[in-house]
């Protein structure tokens, strides 16, 4: 009886939702709506209210028949208002950095009212507040700098850019040298994303202010390295791509950073970490050269597949993470294997997340206090 009642209620809810979606949109009368933190300066929408509801509006072509909103990979049917504009009011399916697109008769279109970020192309995204993740909010603490650093790559035959975070005290303590973390992005991003989307600098500032992290330098390089004549249209795992990065990273990027920044140039004070493809780089290049990197962080980038390559005399920590909706059992098994072989290894599983930025922000937050101790 209870089963039939629940099914009837579910069917009634679906019917009401469908009927509501098909009707004319009636704008809310409450004036408690305000622009979101991700709404473009000139735009009126999206808006958010105190109940955490988000209001999206889009002017589709007059010929549009079927309009939906894709919000954090969940589709919501849109309604037209009296002026012919399409509207959706919905609560966010997930917290953190989320994709928003309009689907107009099957075509996916960025929301023109939102800021654009780069991830496998330019996308409209929105930042959904997460009270339990306050560690990446800007606070009244000393702030470091993020510097745009250029160096010439003979391997590529062109100038390359890296972003370098230096702690707040860096310029005021010219005689001090610092540990360094080389932090890599994923296949869909570039060297800007760890600071722009991942909030790496803010996370480091807050942890340093709490005395949970030794002041450090963070270097963010681009994963992609192409020799002259290489097919740039190939995907990240193209022939020799990994080897190209390895050579550039070890023979050009590292020496250049050590020549221009006051880093401590030994394995005990050098870490490597990355998300997704950057985690795969850490698990290959970092592991193969564990004589150079004492601290390794693999975020949603697989696991250490060949522990025999790890140097027991230099490796201080192997840290593997993923979202709970990815492959936590595989990580936990690999970490147990590494511990059995005598390595200091640890894992972290981000609750309720998948292959996404909230997983990687949390992973960095968990990783940083463990290194250079």
PLM feature segments, named:
Residues 22-75, 80-373:
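Non-catalytic cap/lid and distal C-terminal segments of serine-dependent acyl enzymes
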Residues 8-17:
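Bacterial N-terminal signal peptides
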Residues 1-9:
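Bacterial N-terminal signal peptides that target proteins for export
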């Amino acid at each position: 009886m209870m089963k039939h009642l629940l099914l009837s209620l579910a069917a009634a809810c679906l019917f009401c939702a469908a009927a509501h979606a098909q009707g004319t949109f009636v704008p809310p009368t409450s004036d408690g709506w305000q622009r979101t933190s991700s709404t473009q300066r000139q735009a009126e929408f999206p808006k958010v209210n105190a109940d955490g509801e988000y209001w999206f509006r889009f002017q589709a072509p007059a010929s549009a028949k079927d309009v939906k909103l894709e919000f954090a990979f969940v589709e919501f049917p849109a309604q037209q208002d009296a002026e012919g504009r399409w509207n959706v009011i919905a609560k966010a399916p997930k917290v953190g950095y989320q994709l928003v697109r309009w689907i107009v008769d099957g075509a996916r279109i960025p929301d023109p009212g939102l800021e654009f970020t780069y991830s496998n192309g330019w996308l409209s995204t929105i930042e959904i507040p997460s009270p339990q993740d306050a560690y990446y909010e800007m606070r009244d603490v000393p702030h470091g700098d993020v510097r745009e650093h250029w160096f010439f790559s003979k391997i590529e035959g062109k100038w390359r850019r890296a972003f370098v975070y230096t702690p707040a005290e860096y310029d005021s303590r010219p005689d001090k040298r610092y540990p360094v973390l080389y932090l890599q992005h994923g296949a869909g991003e570039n060297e800007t994303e760890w600071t722009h989307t991942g909030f790496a600098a803010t996370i480091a500032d807050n942890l340093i202010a709490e005395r949970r992290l030794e002041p450090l330098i963070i270097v963010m390089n681009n994963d992609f390295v192409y020799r002259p004549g290489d097919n740039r249209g190939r995907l990240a795992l193209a022939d020799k791509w990994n080897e190209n990065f390895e050579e550039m990273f070890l023979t050009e990027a590292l020496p250049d950073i050590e020549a221009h920044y006051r880093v401590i140039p030994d394995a005990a004070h050098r870490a490597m970490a990355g998300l997704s493809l950057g985690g795969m780089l850490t698990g290959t290049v970092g592991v193969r050269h564990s004589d150079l990197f004492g601290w390794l962080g693999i975020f949603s980038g697989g696991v250490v597949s060949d522990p025999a390559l790890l140097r027991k005399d230099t490796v201080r920590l192997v840290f593997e993470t993923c979202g709970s909706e990815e492959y936590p059992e595989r990580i936990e098994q690999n970490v147990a294997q590494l511990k059995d072989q005598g390595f200091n290894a640890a894992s972290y599983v981000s609750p309720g997340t998948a292959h996404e930025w909230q997983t990687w922000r949390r992973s960095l937050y968990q990783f940083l206090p463990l290194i250079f101790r």
